[in-house]
Structures are given as C-alpha cells and as structure tokens.
C-alpha cells in the first residue's frame, strides 16, 4: 500500500534556476546549469510543483515568511540531494509567497546594487555574488543563512547583508492586504541602519562605525545623490594626505589664510588637535565627524594656496589638479560621516568649509544648490534659536549661524535669486558674537567675558555679519517708496557706523590681517554708499503686472560724479587687494565687484567730462580684465554678456578721447601702481562727515566671495569715542572727492537717462538669466 502511494506521487520537477529566470534565458535545468557556470555565479536551482495556469490558477492566502519551510542548501557543483516531499497545499502557498517576496526583494536588490556600485572596492563579480546571496536568503530562510555565512562571507562594508536581511525576513509580522508592506519595512530597516552608521553625536562614543574611517560604508548620508562626487562614483583617486607632516603644514596655512576669515572654528582647539596631536574636544580618536572636519580644513587650505605655496608643499603647480584632489577627498570624508542622517555641529562646520572652498574654486551652481542643505541642517540643529548653554558653545553656534546666513545671501546674489533666509528671520535671529580673541575662549568656560577694544580675531568677521543683515534689508525689501527709502538710509547708516567703529585706530601696517581688514571694510563701505544710489534691483513683476515697477525719480544730489567716484573707490580697493603683495594670502577670497564695475562703465559712457573719463578709464579696463580672467559659469554668464555689451558701447565713445585700442586694451593704471606702494595712514579719524550714507548691497564689495577676511593678528589698542570717518584719506589719485568737478563746474549728466540706462542693464541681466534656465 505504501509503495503504491509512492508511485502515484510524482517527484518534484526541476524548474529553471533563479538567475536564468530573472535574465529570461533558457535554462538546461542541470545542477549547476551551464549559464551560471559560464557567468561564474552560484546556481540556485528551483524544485517545486509547477504553478497552476488558466482557470485553475488561484492566489493562495497570504502568509508570513516565517512559515516558509526551509530547503536544503545546494552546493555550487555536484549532484543534487533528494528533496523532501511536500504536500500540494503547502507547495502552492510557498510558491505564492515566494513570488510575492521575490518581487519586493528584486526592488531591494536594485537599490542595494546601486549603492554597492558607488563604493570604492566594488566589482561586478562581488555585486553578482551579493545578488545571489540575497536570493538564497529569501528562498531558503533560516538554514540557508548559516550556509551563506560560512561559504560566502561578506565584509563588514558590504552593507551587512547577513545581519540585516535575515532579521527583516524572519521578524516580519503576517502580511497585510497592502502589497507594499514588506517593502516599506525593508526600507525602514535600511534607513535605521544608515542612521546608526552615520551617527556623529558629540556625546556618544561610537565603537564600530567611527573607528574605521577608511572602510567604505553605506551611511553616506545621501551626498552622492546630491552630486558631490561629480561623474566618478567609484572615487578611484590617490589620497593626497599621505602623512602627518603635510597635515601640519596645511593646518598652519589654514590658521594664517583661512581661519582669520572664516571664524567658525576655535583656533586654540584646532592647534592642539592638528599641530600637537591631542583629541578634538570630547570626540574619540578617528571619529568620522572629526575626519570630515580635518579633510574640510585641508581642502579649504588648498583652495587658498598660491602657486608658490603649491610648488613648495606638493612639488606641483596649482593648475595640476591639486585642489580637485583635496575636494574629492573631502567629499569622501563627508559621505562617510553621514551628517545628513545624524547632523552635528562638527559635521556642519566641515560642510560649511567645504562649501566656501567649493565656491572659490568653482563658480557654478553646485555651491548655490548645496547652501540650502547647510541652511536646513543649521535649523535642524537649532542654531537660529538661543539656548541656555555654556558661553563657549553659545559663541561657536552664533558664529556658525551667521556665517551660514552670509553664505545664503552671497549665493542668492551670485545666482540672481532670493535668499532662503528672509529679512525678517535674519533680523530676529541676529545675535552677534563677542568681539574677542579666540584665546579668550575655552571649551570649559561657563562665564561671559566682555567685548575687547581694538583689532581682534573676530573683527572682520563681525563686519561681515553686519553686512549680511544690511544686505537683505536693502536688496530684498518692499517696493520703492519714500518710507522705504528712508528705511534704507537707516540700515545703511547703521551698518557704516557699526563697521567703522570696529576699525577705529586700526594700524594697517602692523600685519597683513590688519591691512586686509582695513581695505576690505572700506571697500564694503564704499559699496554701501554706491548701492544707496544704484541698488541691485532686478526687475520683478508687481501686483500681477508683467512690467517691472517704476523706479523713483533720482534725487538732486544723485548725479554722475558722485556715482562714478563711489564706483571707482570700490574698484580701486578691489584691484589693490588683487595686486598688492600684502593681500596675496587672501586673494582666493576676493572677487572683482561686477556691480561697481557696471556702474562705472555706465556713468563713463554718459559723462561729458573728458578729464574724468581719462582718469577713470584705466581703472575700469584693469578691473574688467581681472573679471574676465576669473571666468564665470552658470548664472554668472547672465552678468558677463550684458556687461561686455555695455563696455563695448563705452569704448566706442571713449576711444576718440583716449586713443584706446579697443581690440587690445592695456592696463596703464599709474595711479593704481602708486597706490599699491603707498603707505596706509595709521589713524582713520576724519573731520569730514559724509552726507551720502548708503544702503549696502553685499555684491558691490565682494560680489561672490565667502564670508570673513583677515590674517595674522595685530596688537590690541584702545578705542576712542566714535567720530564720523572718511572712507580713506589716501585713496590715491582716484580719490576725486576733492576735485572741483563735484563743485558744479561741470554740468551734471541727465540723472533720468543714467537711471534708465541702469535699469536697462538690469533687464538684460534678467533676460539672460531666463535664457539659461533649462
């Protein structure tokens, strides 16, 4: 009787293997099949009853994958052992559940393979092996897991398949009627795993993820999807940081050329960490966030290096791609830190340094796009809100938030867009840090200290913090009106007073930092006065109209000579910082102010004064050539084309007067040469108050530069009671304030024509920006 029953029960058929089924190719149904042997992968045979077809097909009741009976593992080669007999009911249920699982795991496999392909040590064979391991885990459940762990072990970096996938498959509750419940749970497990890897909390010591920074991992925080790594996802470059000595050299340059400008790190703490080998704050050794900060410091330093410094340190020229190598290494460290998943102050500081260096290296839209990420992370960390914390943490959080606010404003100007942080929000979150030296601060300090008098580590940083506040109020306010104009004057006057108060009795000859702070601040103040007369206002529709709002009539004192004088002041200062040897360490930061250049060109093309054009044109040509050599990209092309058209028109008019060869303009700026060599006064007190206080427009000073400026620190001196200061009493031959032209000897230019020409230029820039949109 038993033998007859065995004869009636047919053996389980041998169907196409898993790989052939997925590839939709014919399988010879041997073990292993020839297709899998040729591909060099593990063949996963399928032994089950054939699924019913036609009217006999019916969907089995959904069941939990924990009820899937295990199958015996099949070796890579050799005979297939005899299978266990299964009932028709259990076979049909298992088949239905297998199909449901495979559809979901196939989607999971595609995601995992795409992540694995982006890792450093990825290879096609390894990806195929992981793919087959996933199918084996789903098809054979518990017993297959142990065999795969023993036979085909995967490294820790290969997404920890053996740890995460079986846990998900076995720990699932019974399936619900919703078909994507299993997939959603799988995605939740992956996100949870990525969050653990990317943890960078300052109070938590990570024993496994943070102590292996050189190991590829999937907790990259999604930076690859943001395009940080460009078109090379495998990241197969040679590391640049080969030794501690090179890191020390870069740190020393950072403290001289970057740290006085970008005051988001504590200088003594960085010195103890990178120069003396001590731990960084309370972080464990080789923490991923600390490694990201180290790479960001080196990248920012590389972006600030001159050609001579590159040759001395790396025996390579700057044009050989040394900065790009540091950028890729910084991107890899940021990806490993996972700061998008679990943000921290240290990780955000590294990201801000990366954006500042990226902005100085690349004028495209990458830094503009990623600035939004920095703003969101800062708000996620609560940097825009005041908290009850230690004095040290309070100061560092304020510096970081105001630096990000400044970056947001700079990015909006460079791409002709509104900032993410509104004027109201910037005003309500404006909590100024103390005007002190970094040596006055200590991480263990709990009590507050008063502001210092004189030049400090944070002097220029505080000037730029005032700029980001005034720039929003002046350029992104309400429509033009008498009330708005008065409010702009108040904003401009407040900025000028705050900025110049910080520089009282600053000795610009005492150090490069003092020299650069002196001239940089005066360039900003000149740009503020210029913006009061010619604000950067791109035409925008108003009240549903497609026409730009009409500008108010110019005031009587708004004449050609004042505009040209202020524009030349800005250009003279910017050119001085580009040519004077004392500004060499900060040249990476300064860009040519296209706004002031456009105003100067426009006013020269309308001015009837031959003497004034002859004195101003060499400065204009020199600055225009500097702007062209810097190059533009992305939305900045919209500025370059109308500016080129404007200067061609001005050359046509100026050539008969200056005998200027339009085809090959030369730089014969004798006065500027004298300016570079002339000493700067030691006292800035002035008895000549200025009537024209301006609304500050940030791009008039450093149109697309990152935040602060400075270098080696000057000694501290006392501050006298504030008196109204002149821009610069030694603004060389181009300081035409004292010339009789302003006294009315030359009839002024038609202010209406000047204003219409300026509005036409802004309209052309807006039109070019729209053409660049995809």
Swiss-Prot record:
UniProt entry keywords in alphabetical sequence: DNA-binding, Metal-binding, Nucleus, Transcription, Transcription regulation, Zinc
Q: Where is this region: Disordered?
A: 61-94, 536-559, 665-697
Which residue windows does the record flag with biased composition (Pro residues)?
67-78
Give the Pfam families listed for this entry: Fungal_trans, Zn_clus
Kindly give the InterPro entries that the UniProt entry links to this protein. Answer: Sec_Metabolite_Reg, Transcription_factor_dom_fun, Zn2-C6_fun-type_DNA-bd_sf, Zn2Cys6_DnaBD
* DNA-binding segment(s): 17-43
Q: Which GO terms describe its cellular component?
A: nucleus
Composition-biased stretches, type Polar residues, lie in 665-674
The signal peptide, as residue positions, is none
Composition skew (Low complexity), residue ranges? 536-548, 675-697
As one GO molecular function, the record gives: DNA binding
Top-level lineage group: Eukaryota
Annotated GO biological processes are: DNA-templated transcription; positive regulation of secondary metabolite biosynthetic process; secondary metabolite biosynthetic process
What does the UniProt entry say about where the protein is found? Nucleus
Q: What does this protein do?
A: Transcription factor that specifically regulates the neosartoricin biosynthesis gene cluster.
Descriptive protein name: C6 finger domain transcription factor nscR
> Source organism lineage?
Eukaryota, Fungi, Dikarya, Ascomycota, Pezizomycotina
């Amino acid at each position: 009787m038993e033998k007859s029953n065995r004869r009636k029960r047919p053996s389980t058929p041998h169907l196409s293997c898993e790989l052939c089924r997925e590839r939709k190719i014919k399988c010879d149904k041997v073990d292993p099949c020839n297709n899998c042997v040729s591909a060099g992968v593990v063949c996963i045979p399928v032994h089950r009853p054939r699924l019913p077809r036609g009217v006999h097909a019916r969907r089995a009741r959904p069941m939990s994958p924990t009820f899937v009976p295990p199958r015996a593992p099949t070796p890579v080669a050799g005979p297939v052992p005899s299978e266990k007999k299964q009932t028709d009911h259990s076979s049909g249920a298992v088949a239905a559940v297998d199909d449901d699982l495979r559809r979901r795991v196939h989607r999971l496999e595609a995601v995992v393979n795409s992540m694995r392909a982006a890792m450093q040590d990825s290879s096609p064979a390894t990806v195929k092996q992981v793919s087959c391991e996933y199918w084996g885990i789903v098809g054979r459940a518990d017993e297959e897991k142990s065999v795969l762990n023993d036979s085909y072990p995967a490294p820790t970096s290969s997404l920890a398949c053996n740890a995460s996938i079986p846990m998900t498959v076995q720990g699932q509750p019974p399936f619900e009627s919703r078909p994507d419940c299993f997939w959603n749970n799988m995605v939740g497990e992956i996100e949870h795993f990525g969050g653990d890897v990317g943890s960078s909390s300052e109070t938590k010591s990570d024993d496994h993820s943070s102590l292996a920074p050189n190991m590829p991992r999937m907790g990259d925080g999604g930076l690859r999807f943001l395009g940080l790594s460009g078109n090379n996802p495998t990241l197969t470059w040679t590391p640049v940081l080969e030794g501690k000595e090179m890191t020390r050299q870069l740190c020393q340059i950072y403290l001289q050329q970057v740290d006085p400008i970008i005051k988001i790190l504590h200088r003594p703490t960085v010195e103890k960490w990178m120069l003396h080998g001590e731990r960084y704050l309370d972080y464990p050794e080789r923490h991923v966030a600390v490694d990201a900060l180290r790479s960001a410091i080196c990248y920012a330093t590389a972006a600030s290096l001159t050609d001579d410094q590159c040759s001395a340190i790396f025996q390579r020229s700057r044009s050989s791609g040394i900065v790009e190598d540091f950028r890729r290494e910084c991107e890899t460290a940021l990806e490993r830190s996972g700061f998008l998943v679990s943000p921290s102050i240290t990780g955000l500081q590294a990201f801000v340094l990366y954006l500042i260096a990226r902005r100085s290296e690349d004028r495209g839209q990458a830094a503009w796009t990623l600035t939004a990420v920095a703003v969101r992370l800062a708000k996620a960390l609560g940097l825009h809100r005041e908290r009850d914390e230690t004095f040290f943490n309070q100061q560092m959080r304020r510096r970081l938030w105001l630096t990000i606010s400044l970056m947001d404003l700079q990015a909006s100007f460079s791409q002709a867009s509104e900032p993410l942080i509104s004027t109201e929000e910037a005003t309500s979150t404006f909590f100024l840090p103390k005007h002190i030296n970094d040596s006055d601060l200590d991480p263990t300090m709990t009590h507050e200290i008063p502001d210092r008098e004189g030049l400090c580590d944070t002097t220029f940083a505080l000037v730029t913090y005032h700029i980001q506040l005034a720039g929003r109020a002046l350029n992104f306010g309400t429509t033009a009106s008498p009330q708005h104009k008065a409010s702009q004057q108040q904003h401009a006057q407040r900025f000028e007073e705050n900025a110049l108060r910080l520089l009282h009795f600053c000795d610009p000859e005492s150090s490069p930092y003092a020299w650069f702070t002196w001239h940089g601040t005066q360039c900003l103040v000149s740009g503020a006065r210029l913006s009061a007369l010619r604000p950067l206002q791109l035409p925008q529709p108003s009240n549903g109209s497609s026409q730009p709002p009409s500008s108010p009539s110019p005031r009587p004192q708004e004449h050609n000579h004042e505009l040209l004088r202020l524009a030349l002041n800005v250009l003279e200062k910017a050119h001085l910082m580009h040519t004077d040897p004392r500004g060499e360490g900060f040249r990476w930061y300064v860009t040519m102010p296209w706004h002031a250049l456009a105003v100067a060109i426009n006013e020269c093309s309308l001015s009837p004064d031959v003497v004034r054009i002859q004195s101003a044109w060499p400065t204009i040509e020199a600055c225009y050539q500097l702007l062209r050599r810097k190059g533009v990209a992305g939305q900045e092309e919209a500025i370059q084309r109308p500016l080129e058209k404007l200067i061609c028109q001005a050359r046509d008019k100026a050539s008969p007067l200056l005998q200027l060869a339009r085809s090959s303009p030369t730089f014969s700026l004798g006065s500027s040469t004298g300016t570079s060599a002339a000493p700067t006064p030691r006292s800035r007190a002035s008895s000549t108050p200025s009537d024209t206080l301006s609304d500050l427009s940030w791009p008039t000073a450093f149109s697309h530069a990152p935040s602060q400026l400075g270098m080696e620190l000057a000694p501290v001196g006392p501050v006298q009671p504030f008196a109204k200061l002149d821009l610069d009493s030694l603004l060389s031959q181009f300081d035409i304030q004292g010339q009789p032209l302003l006294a009315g000897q030359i009839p002024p230019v038609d202010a209406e024509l000047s204003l219409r020409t300026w509005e036409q230029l802004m309209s052309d820039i807006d039109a070019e920006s729209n053409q660049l949109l995809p």
